[in-house]
C-alpha cells in the first residue's frame, strides 16, 4: 500500500521514517536560516515559512553546503553571552587554549588605566589556570577537572587570586578539551560551598513533592501543575509547556502568566520555529538561559594552533542566534529559561535487568519555557534544581504516555472485536449499512464504500463524481498498490484536491476487490485547532513579515490548510486488517478448510511439553512454599486463612491446624489492622501491593509476646477465568533488622559500632554526608556489591557510586537515577521516607533487587549532617520462590497468549466454513449429501462450544450452565463417530454400532453439543487403546421415568467396548482426579467425566478378558405430546 506519508507499524520503519523527516526538516531549517542571513531587515517571515513548506526539490538547497554551513554555525559559534566568561583548557596540561574576551577583566581585574611598557595580561593563551585562583580554589578545580564524570561536581566554587571574588565554575568535557563557564556569585546569594546535586535538589523539593502526589490519568493536569511550580520557583513572567507533535510542529499545552500579558495557550507553530539543530542541542544541554536578548555578545578567542574548532554546545553561556533574539524581542520577551523534557522513545528496553542491556533511546517530547519582559539571571544552583524538576516531570510524562498506550491497546482490541463483528454480517454492505460501521473503526469525518459500481457514503465525503475521479487517479498512478494513505491529497498529487475544499484533505483508501474500494476521509487540521491567544483590537494589524507567535500561528495554519491529522500506525493496521478480511471473505471453502488444517496443526503442536512445564513449575512452587525458610501464608476471598507454612508457624508460635480458618485480621497487631485490611482489599481487587510492613501477634507459653515485624508482598491467586479466588502473602521477617535500626536511631554517640559490626544480622549500610559524598560503606555492602570501602569513600554517591554510566553500581536507567535522587533529597530535607524498591548491578554484573530505607543523620543540635541508607534483601529461599513464581506466571501467560491467539484464529476460518456450508445448503443436494452437511454442522457447534470454554474450573467444580436443546441421538452419535473415523481407519479398527433403531430415533432434550463432546472423547481414548485390527462397538439403553403429564425423565446408558489390554490405570486415575499431575489425554477425560456429572450421570470402566468397556450414563428428558 503506497502512502504519501507512509504509515508502517514496525518500530524500525517508524524510526526510519522519523530520521528521514528530521533530515528533510533540517534542510528546510537551513534554507530558512540562509534566507534570514541574506535578507537582513527585509526578511519576510510568513512568506519564507510558506515557501519552505512547499514540496518539490526545486525549493530545497541546491547542495549540501547550505545545510553543512548552517549546522556548523549552530554548533560551533564563536560568541557567548556577557553574564559570565568562558575558558577552554587542554585536558592534560590545564593550560588555556581559548578564552572569551571578557575573561581577563572578570577573573584577573585588569586595570583600565593605560598599562606600563612591558606589562602583560595575566590571562591569555597558554596560561595555567591554577595561577589565577586562590590555593584552595585551584586544588578544588584540579580535583574536579581530573574527575571522570566532571559535570557531576558542578558547580565548583572558586575565588579569584587578585580580587577574591567568588565564581561558580561550571565544567563540561568536549573532544580534546575542557570547557569552563564562570558565573559570578551575586552578593545577595548564599554561595554553594560544595559540589553535588543534593544541594540543588533542595530548592525543588516542594515542586517535586507536589508532582509526585498527583494522581495519574491526566496529562493536562500534570502540565498545568508543572508550569505553576516553575512559575513559583523561578519568578518569570510567563511559563509555558510546549509539546512537539508527530510531524514536529509544536503546541502550547499549558501556560501561566502574570496579569496583563497576552496568553499563548493553544498556540500551534510550524516545525521551523524550533529548528532540528536546536532540538538536538536541547538533548545535549537540557537547560538553556538567555539573560538579555539585547545584550552585546562577547567573542571567544581560540588558539590559532588548534587543529579543530571548539564546540560550545554544552555551554550555557553560548550566545543565541540573531534570528531567535529578534523573535524574542518581537514578542516582548527579553529573557528566557528553557528546560528540555526528554522521554523514552518507543519499544526499547523493558524490565530486563541484564547488565549488558543498553539504555533506552530518548526523544524530545517538549519544552518548559519561561519568558520575562525584563532581563533576568537565574543562578546555577536554581537552574540545576529546574533541570532535576524537569527530569521528574519527564518521568511522569512517560507514565502518562504509557497509560495512553495501554488505552490505545484496549482500543485496538475493541477494533478487533468490531472487525470480527463485521465479518459475521452480509459482506461487504453490512459494514456501512449497520451499526457499528466503518466510521467507528478509526477517527474520521467521513467514509465510503465503492462496491459493484455503487457508492455507499457515510458522513462528510466527496461527491459521487469526485469519488470516481479519485478511483481513476488511484488506478492510473497507484496501479501496483492495494491502497493509499495520506494526510494531504494535495501533496500526494491528486489533481482535484483543491476542488474538494476543506471537507476532504486526508484520505485512507484500500482496494477490496478488482473494482471495490473502501475510503476514510479527514478534514483539514486547522478545523481542529483552537487558539486561546489574544484577539485583535479594532483597527490593529499584524505585520506578518515579523517573527512573532501570532505570525507563527498564521504560518502554521497556512502550512496545514490542505492537510489533515496524520493517520496513526495502529489506525492503518486496523484498516489493513479489515481489507484482508473483506478480500478473503469471498474465497472458496477449500481455502477455508486449508486454513483450518493449519490451525489444527498449530493446536496439535501445543502438546504436553507446555503442560509438563507448567506442572513442574507448579510442583516446585508448592514444595518451596511448604519448605521455605521465609513466612508464607494465604487467605480465601473472605480473608480466612487457608495456608500457613512451617516458618510462619515457627515465628508466631501458632500451629498450622490452629491457624487455618481464622480471619487474618485477628492475628495481626491492632496497629497493623488498617494496613493489612487495605492490603487485603486491594489484593482481592487484583491490585497487588509490595513491600508492605506490618506486625503480627506471637503465641505460646513464653513471657515474651513481642510481635514479629514482616515485609510482605501480596500475590492474588486466580482461577483459569482470571478471577481472584484468594491472596497469598510472601513475607520476610525483619524483626532482627528492625530492632537494630531502632537501636541505631536511638544512639546519640558511637554509630560506628553498628556500621562496622560484621554480625550477619547487620544489613548492608552506606551513607553520605550533607554534600553528597559517600561517607559510609559497611562490610555487608562490600559483600553484596563487590566494591571495597576504599573504592567508594569520598566519591559522589549520586553519579560515581550509583549512576547510569561509569558508576561503581550501575542503575538500570535514568528514571531509577532520578527516583534515587528524589529519595535522598527528601530525607536530607527532613521528610519521612517510606521503604522503596531499589536495584543496581553489582561488580560481577548480577542485578541486585532490594528495599531501600533512608534515615537522616543528626548532630547534637539536631541538624542534618548526612544520610544512612539501609538495604533489606530477600532471603535466598524467598528469591528462589519469587523467581519460580515469575517463571510460572511468564509460562502461564505465554501459553494463555498462544491459546488466545489460536482460539481467535480458529474463529475466522470456522466462520468461513459455516458460510460455505450455508451456501451449499441452498443448492440441490441429495439426501446423503445433506446428512454429511448435518454432521459437519454438529461438529462445528461442538467446536464453538469448546472455544467458549475459558473457565475450566467452572466445569470441574460443577458450575457450568447446560443448555436444553431438542435432538436425536442418531445425529449426536454419527457426529461423534465421524471424529474418530480417520484414526480408526488408519489402525484398521472395525466400528460396530449396536444401537437399536428406536433408540437412535428417539427425540431427547439436553445439551447435545456437550454430550457429543463427551462421547467423542471416550471414543478417541478407546481407539488409542485398541490394537491395530481390533474392534470397537457402541451400544446403549434408554430407561424412562415419567415425572409429569408431558415430561419423562430418561436415563441414557452408552457402552463403548473395545478389544485389547484396556486403558492404562494411570490415565483412569487422572480421569477420576486422583493424580496430582495429568496428561493432555487425562485432562480431556477428567473434563468429560465432569460434564457427565453435570448431567447427573457417572462414568465406569470395566475390564474383562480381552475386552474392556466404558459405561457412560446421563440424565436427559423425553418430551411426549399431551392429549387434547
From Swiss-Prot:
PAS domain ranges (all copies): 617-687, 747-821
Coiled coil location: none
PANTHER family in the record: OS08G0260000 PROTEIN (PTHR47876), PHYTOCHROME 1 (PTHR47876:SF3)
SMART domains linked: GAF (SM00065), HATPase_c (SM00387), HisKA (SM00388), PAS (SM00091)
Domain GAF: 218-401
SUBUNIT field: Homodimer.
Biological process, per Gene Ontology: detection of visible light; red, far-red light phototransduction; regulation of DNA-templated transcription
Compositional bias ranges of the Low complexity kind: 1-14
InterPro entries assigned: GAF (IPR003018), GAF-like_dom_sf (IPR029016), HATPase_C_sf (IPR036890), His_kinase_dom (IPR005467), HisK_dim/P_dom (IPR003661), PAS (IPR000014), PAS-assoc_C (IPR000700), PAS-like_dom_sf (IPR035965)
Family according to the record: Belongs to the phytochrome family.
The protein's name in its UniProt record: Phytochrome A1
A molecular-function term among this protein's GO annotations: protein homodimerization activity
Chain's role: Regulatory photoreceptor which exists in two forms that are reversibly interconvertible by light: the Pr form that absorbs maximally in the red region of the spectrum and the Pfr form that absorbs maximally in the far-red region. Photoconversion of Pr to Pfr induces an array of morphogenic responses, whereas reconversion of Pfr to Pr cancels the induction of those responses. Pfr controls the expression of a number of nuclear genes including those encoding the small subunit of ribulose-bisphosphate carboxylase, chlorophyll A/B binding protein, protochlorophyllide reductase, rRNA, etc.
Domain PAC residues, every copy: 690-746
Domain Histidine kinase: 901-1118
Transcription listed as a keyword: yes
GO cellular component: nucleus
Organism phylogeny: Eukaryota, Viridiplantae, Streptophyta, Embryophyta, Tracheophyta
The record's account of how the chain is modified after translation: Contains one covalently linked phytochromobilin chromophore.
